[in-house]
């Protein structure tokens, strides 16, 4: 059954309370099962407001004098890497020898849909479809060439809506890796030195080495200079020429010209100040066991007993992004950076640290995580909206094979 639906832009002055009520009703989990709830801290657009361009729409039904808000959707637009272009330079005028190949990113304007909600009492009435189409219209009006969304593999209602009615195609299956924050600090390998970079230096490193990675945001400087970005860190062997710390850092350009045999980089984003999470539906026994492990971890930290994070009450998280590196010990460098990020999260009062990486990410084994907390296969679906923006003949990005790595924008996690 379809109903007459009016879709309009979200107005915080009159919609906030109703939107929060719909959010709560949508997040009621099944009886007897664990469910993840999100507290947006009174800001329904917190997960898109840091993007270059964003919008939130709401859906209403009923007569003009008695409108009822029954759904909402968020969306944002940014410019990202969708492919690469290569140019061969012959420096000796000899076509067969000494050619230099220059690789550059191909950019496109990409839109992202998230936070689609329809009140449980008004589902299967075409409301979700109308919200998606209205958001896609806004995307097209603002020059977006592609639109994508992320969901869990087993969210059949969402997958069916987008891949069925809305014409999206399954595109990438990254993994969300989640690790608890223990009551004790973790030790960082003494063989590794961790250096914190200035945002300008971090930007240069990312642009020089990672700008051709799929989904790399062209406005990486805005990401790194955002107040929620807690820093970019590089790990190097302590015995290398850069092992004495920040004093030995030569700048990103010189570092990449003369790198150590192994190194890694990672940035940290503070999601805790945007939203909180909570696991509900746990039995009393689970809660008691969880609390007991944390008490032991806190009072006897030298035992290094892994503790179950305090996820049964609201908790925050730090997100690790821009993960990369090179060399035979790159995984160990990543592990050291993740340990450093864990300690930052502990200082910040977070419950977990998380990262999202491509399914074939070469460095994923260096990222500590609990399988029970992680999602082995998140699902990203994509749709082509137009052909007017991408700077080059990349073809149809939706049909391109996955690369080894992706760059996950922390503003939309």
UniProtKB/Swiss-Prot annotation:
EC number: 2.3.1.-
Protein origin, superkingdom: Eukaryota
Keyword Transferase: yes
GO MF assignments: acyltransferase activity, transferring groups other than amino-acyl groups
Pfam families: Acetyltransf_1 (PF00583)
Keyword Transferase carried by entry: yes
Domain N-acetyltransferase residues, every copy: 5-187
SUPFAM superfamilies associated with the record: Acyl-CoA N-acyltransferases (Nat)
Top-tier EC class: transferase
Record keywords: Acyltransferase, Transferase
CDD domains per UniProt: NAT_SF
Family that this chain belongs to: Belongs to the acetyltransferase family.
PANTHER family: ACYL-COA N-ACYLTRANSFERASES (NAT) SUPERFAMILY PROTEIN, N-ACETYLTRANSFERASE HLS1-LIKE-RELATED
Entry protein name: Probable N-acetyltransferase HLS1-like
